[in-house]
């Protein structure tokens, strides 16, 4: 069964695939798989190598590369889920690569229904690095993961024995938001403040100030590029403006598929 799935994944030109039994998946913050998919037995995890767009000094080009990857991965997720249903008679559900995710007091909108990092580690696709991303043995942390939940019973792939992360510390030192200063933990709020300046917090600050100033100042505010960036973010969705912890990582920089 695994080999049939691997061959299908290869035809989609996905870079890697791993399998994890539901019992081997453990996430400290995401809800139990049973609450999402009663009867889920396995997770099929797909790995995609980032384009070199993430190296661009132009944040918009870097983010465009990520958006291209996300669009491609959504299509692949759906195609593989359909393949599992039609070829194996299985039930299958796709997991969001990013949004939508639960919005509630407990998670503060920063926790996905399935932790793709923990799923990838359980599926033998890498191990956690100093930047708290999963480092793939070939592609390093320049890897995006997606997943499909299924009721097929598929045994887990062997875990990565030797962590690809070299613990060089470049990601910790290079984080402009100082979000990685505490070992083993990412300060999400510090990361978001730097990484997503035109997200929800940026919009709250803008409109809070907008309501307090004069009509003349309001006109100036909506003519400022800051407002245009907020408008663009509201139109196309969350945008990342920092890829530092990926860019400085030496693991997999010259890897090929």
Describe each region flagged by the PLM.
Residues 68-257:
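Catalytic cores of enzyme domains
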Residues 1-75:
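Non-catalytic, usually N-terminal nucleic-acid engagement modules in DNA/RNA processing proteins
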